[in-house]
């Protein structure tokens, strides 16, 4: 198969490089989406022996509108048939439940806001999948449709941001070690999303115009509140201002996150301005949601954070203060900061400028230029 867009936009490999690649087997994770579809095609063009693997990581239930595994599998199979490659199938639902979902529930129960996509990458895509591909399928590499890049210079493997800054997914992959990165290929990380779609359209792939998934990893885009209530009992309570004034009722602390503005159910409050309210604290002991009014309210701001559960890509803990940038949530602009090691698994991060909505349970991910250094889980804010 040929793609005019691919021929024009992507660098051509030499015949020697293609011959070298032809001795390597790559198992490409096929999600039924456009990114993994085009990744498999690019790997073929680069000469690799390519096979696909579809992972089922969530058991179907009665949420037929949200669990799209059957449709995704059909799309993945159609793409593999079109490309002429074999598609393997594996069920990691038990691993997902034990290593991702139970942690997800425990964090919400503890009043934190976890990022299950990060844990899914750590425990499923780059652990269970990688081990299965190498040990059972004889892979030399795995490949995924993530928008990140890998750098190999002087024997040093590094994880870099994706070329398309609008789609960069390095934030979700900071737990990977340099060895895991070295065993992984990220074909679409070197190109921009519009080109990925154009290649898919060129090839007539069924996934060319398929909408990107934006739901929780492997759970889909169901109504989150209803979904969470099936696993954790809600405990309604009071909404109070920072000064203690009661201004409403909340549905359960687990449904709210720091910095949240929408969905608080607070209308106009007598004697107060029309400025919006923001969540600034979740008081678990008293089951109180604390809010502040105005987007420039000092209660929203943090001077820094404490992060634990650290993962550095090179797996070498820092021993001295580090100047770098940090993201405390996906799609955030880089924040200039200083990282101060407290021990091998805990750092203090001091921002150059105060930041809003620093949320315990989310991840702080560190960068130097294009390189993703690693990160950790936000334990608490520093006010």
From Swiss-Prot:
Q: Name one Pfam family in it.
A: tRNA_Me_trans_C
- InterPro entries, alphabetized: MnmA-like, MnmA-like_C, MnmA-like_central, MnmA-like_central_sf, Rossmann-like_a/b/a_fold
Keywords recorded for this protein, A-Z: ATP-binding, Cytoplasm, Disulfide bond, Nucleotide-binding, RNA-binding, Transferase, tRNA processing, tRNA-binding
Question: Region Interaction with target base in tRNA: start and end of each range?
Answer: 115-117
Q: Where does ATP bind?
A: 29-36, 55, 145
Which reactions is this enzyme annotated as catalysing?
S-sulfanyl-L-cysteinyl-[protein] + uridine(34) in tRNA + AH2 + ATP = 2-thiouridine(34) in tRNA + L-cysteinyl-[protein] + A + AMP + diphosphate + H(+)
List cellular component terms (GO).
cytoplasm
> Which enzyme class, named as a word?
transferase
Question: Source organism's superkingdom?
Answer: Bacteria
Q: What is this protein called?
A: tRNA-specific 2-thiouridylase MnmA
């Amino acid at each position: 198969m040929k793609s005019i867009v691919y021929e024009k936009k992507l660098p051509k490999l030499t015949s020697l490089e293609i011959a070298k690649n032809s001795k390597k087997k790559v198992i490409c994770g096929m999600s039924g989406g456009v990114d993994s579809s085009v990744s498999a095609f690019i790997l073929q063009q680069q000469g690799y022996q390519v096979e696909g693997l579809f992972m089922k990581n969530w058991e179907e239930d009665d949420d037929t509108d949200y669990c799209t595994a059957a449709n995704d599998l059909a799309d993945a199979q159609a793409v593999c048939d079109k490309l002429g490659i074999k598609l393997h199938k594996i069920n990691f639902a038990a691993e997902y439940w034990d290593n991702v979902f139970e942690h997800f529930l425990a964090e919400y129960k503890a009043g934190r806001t976890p990022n299950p996509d990060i844990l899914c990458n750590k425990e499923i895509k780059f652990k269970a999948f990688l081990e299965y591909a190498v040990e059972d399928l004889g892979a030399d590499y795995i490949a995924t449709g993530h928008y990140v890049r890998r750098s190999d210079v002087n024997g040093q493997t590094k994880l870099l941001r994706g070329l398309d800054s609008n789609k960069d997914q390095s934030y979700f992959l900071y737990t990977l070690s340099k060895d895991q990165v070295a065993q992984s290929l990220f074909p679409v990380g070197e190109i921009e999303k519009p080109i990925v779609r154009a290649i898919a359209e060129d090839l007539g792939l069924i996934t060319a115009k398929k909408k990107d998934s934006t739901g929780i990893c492997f759970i889909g885009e169901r109504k989150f509140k209803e979904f969470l209530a099936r696993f954790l009992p809600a405990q309604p309570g009071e909404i109070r201002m920072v000064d203690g004034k009661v201004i409403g009722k909340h549905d359960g602390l687990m449904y709210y996150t720091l910095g949240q503005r929408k969905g608080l159910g607070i209308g106009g409050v007598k004697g107060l301005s029309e400025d919006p309210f923001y969540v600034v604290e979740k008081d678990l002991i008293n089951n109180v949601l604390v809010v502040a009014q105005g987007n420039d309210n000092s209660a929203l701001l943090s001077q820094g954070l404490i992060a634990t559960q650290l993962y550095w890509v090179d797996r070498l803990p820092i021993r001295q203060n580090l100047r770098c940038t940090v993201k405390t949530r996906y799609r955030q602009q880089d924040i200039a900061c200083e990282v101060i090691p407290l021990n091998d698994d805990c750092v203090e991060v001091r921002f150059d400028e105060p930041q809003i909505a620093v949320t315990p349970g989310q991840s702080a991910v560190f960068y130097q230029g294009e390189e993703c250094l690693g990160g950790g889980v936000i334990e608490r804010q520093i006010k």
